[in-house]
Amino acid sequence: MERIIGGKYKLGRKIGGGSFGEIFLATHVDTFEIVAVKIENSKTKHPQLLYEAKLYRILEGGSGIPRIKWFGVDGTENALVMDLLGPSLEDLFVYCGRKFSPKTVLMLADQMLTRIEFVHSKGYLHRDIKPDNFLMGLGRKANQVYLIDFGLAKRYRDANTNRHIPYRENKNLTGTARYASCNTHLGIEQSRRDDLESLGYVLLYFLRGSLPWQGLKAVDKKQKYDKICEKKISTPIEVLCKNHPVEFASYFHYCHTLTFDQRPDYGFLKRLFRDLFSREGYEFDYIFDWTIIKYQQAQKSRNQSQAVPGSSNPRAMPVDTSNHRGGPNISYEAEASERVRSANAIGPSPQINNNTAAGRTPGFDHPVHKNMNMPSTSLSPAGTSKRNVGPETSNSGYGSGNRTGWTSSFMSPEK
């Protein structure tokens, strides 16, 4: 029997789940738009969908913030209907061999900083900055970075007085241990500086391929958190950022100079990375590492199919949109190929070369989110394999165990 959510969304297949509940594809019965539906039992011990829906309403209209289509109670469950988005940066990181080029990291960093700044401008902290919570868009918004999962978000300004929340200590760790700030590990109340420090760890994770505190053995979660804390605090910034541009060390040093209630200079941090981008001669052409890999695979697959009829490429990108299309028949493969051809004018088998001709002006003086006003193309996510979630995943601070975002079907195991 078909299940209709909110009177107009026909529930489809399950694409993910976690301690909060489950995530499904759904189709609008009239427009056939494909959306994502997050469902939780209304009697759950720690319901979060109502709070999350409230946050999305507050952030509504911001670039890179998913739109809420509907929220309400459906029988015995709470349901949140949202824009369907593409793969997470964690998915794409794995797809690209667990390392991103500096060019890709810098293009992502600019948008990620803008997302965090926007959330802060609305008076909230995210408190769970990690690769799994940044998703790429689909179709014409495939180059736009989205920030999701506000289940752990918290106001840092009093709604009535607009005063900053008071400094506190002895707080439980809230967020994901791998990317948590040093102060968060030490039990200090989080503020804007902590979201930014977490972003720094995400960027280094992308550049390095891993962080020094991954893979630590422990008998339980507390011991693991303690070991991560000890390793993180004892690792000098210069060691963490060794063999990478000095701007990344400067980023961390700046974060560590911020006082508890100080407003970060987001523009300074973006200029730091934009100047590096310009100095390296990169062009802001939205050709990410995965764009090139997808293009190369498309070319290889095309050549193989010409040589052997019926052959196919066994390695699927997490943004494959061959199934469950809800809008125009737009192939991500063709889209990626076109971007590579038109932007770089490169040959049929491009290599990942992130340099442009000397003196070329990068595209930072143009809006980063140049596609934000274009119509969205509703496409389905690809890989929906469930993976185990390890002890470094999000912790809400009240001991409820692991908690994942609404795209948990894309989650990779913590190491």
Curated annotation (Swiss-Prot):
Main localization, broad class = cytoplasm
Q: What is its EC number?
A: 2.7.11.1
Per UniProt, ATP binds at I15, G16, G17, G18, S19, F20, G21, E22, I23, K38
The induction annotation reads: Induced by blue light.
Parts of the chain that traverse the membrane? none
Report the locations given in the UniProt record. Cytoplasm; Nucleus
Q: Return the Polar residues bias intervals.
A: 303-314, 373-415
Catalytic residues as annotated in Swiss-Prot or TrEMBL: D128 (proton acceptor)
Annotated segments matching region Disordered: 303-330, 344-415
Tissue-specific expression: Expressed in seedlings, stems, leaves and flowers.
What reaction gets catalysed by this protein? L-seryl-[protein] + ATP = O-phospho-L-seryl-[protein] + ADP + H(+); L-threonyl-[protein] + ATP = O-phospho-L-threonyl-[protein] + ADP + H(+)
Q: Which superkingdom?
A: Eukaryota
Phenotype when inactivated?
Hypersensitivity to blue light (BL) leading to shortened hypocotyls in BL.
Q: Name one GO biological process term.
A: blue light signaling pathway
Q: Which UniProt keywords apply?
A: ATP-binding, Cytoplasm, Kinase, Nucleotide-binding, Nucleus, Phosphoprotein, Serine/threonine-protein kinase, Transferase
Mod. after translation = Slightly autophosphorylated.
Residue span(s) of domain Protein kinase: 9-277
Entry GO CC: cytoplasm; nucleus
Q: Which GO terms describe its molecular function?
A: ATP binding; protein serine kinase activity; protein serine/threonine kinase activity
Q: Which InterPro entries did the record assign?
A: CK1_Ser-Thr_kinase, Kinase-like_dom_sf, Prot_kinase_dom, Protein_kinase_ATP_BS, Ser/Thr_kinase_AS
PANTHER family assigned to the protein according to its UniProt record, in alphabetical order: CASEIN KINASE-RELATED
UniProt function note:
Protein kinase involved in blue light responses (e.g. hypocotyl elongation and flowering) by phosphorylating CRY2 to reduce its stability.
Q: Which family does it belong to?
A: Belongs to the protein kinase superfamily. CK1 Ser/Thr protein kinase family. Casein kinase I subfamily.
* Record's protein name: Casein kinase 1-like protein 3
Q: Which species is this record about? A: Arabidopsis thaliana
The major lineage groups are: Eukaryota, Viridiplantae, Streptophyta, Embryophyta, Tracheophyta
